[in-house]
Amino acid sequence: LYFGGENTNRLFVKNTNDPLKRDQKITFDNIQVLFDKDSNAYLNLRNTILSNSCFINYGFYTLAELNVLKDLGYDIDTEDFVGTGIYQSGTNNELLAHDISKGFYAFSDTTHEYQPDKPSKIPLSIGTHVYGNYNEVHQNSNIASIGFASVGIRVDGSYNNIIVPKNTTI
């Protein structure tokens, strides 16, 4: 069983190099839904809140999980919680390059844009989240958050290179 929805699909489609998948409206093979022995559903996203992993490495939802909840009808502005999400993996022969030019700051409910003059005050927020392996990420924009337990850059994966230019602040 797989879950797909408009927001979830958008996250995975923008993070694909497959032009055929990028043109699809909605696919239903983005996130696998599994069931434990007691028939409780969980997502096949390692080490996340909505998974059944033995080890949960962060006490809040990932962007993928927030998008699932949004697709199920919850009223969530994901931009409040996560600036940029990368859900993609390269190979050991070829790293996937990502240039992040969108910063993370306080998000305005009225203009629906980030406010570069105000840091985010949302607890447990993440400026940039990399969920995958073999990525090269150039964080070319600032991340400003003063929320309790906020993280500038969260990496769930291996063999990722994160490059932060000297003039970028996190």
Question: Where do the PLM segments sit?
Answer:
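Generic marker of "main functional regions" within proteins
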Residues: 60, 79-82, 138, 153, ...
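General "foldedness" signal
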Residues: 83, 88-90, 151, 157, ...
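Weak global preference for isoleucine
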Residues: 26, 31, 49, 56, ...
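Beta-strand-rich solenoid/repeat architectures in extracellular/passenger domains
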Residues: 93-124, 134-149, 159-170
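Structural detector of coil-to-beta-strand junctions
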Residues: 125-129, 150-154
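Extracellular zinc-dependent metalloprotease catalytic-domain scaffold
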Residues: 1-94
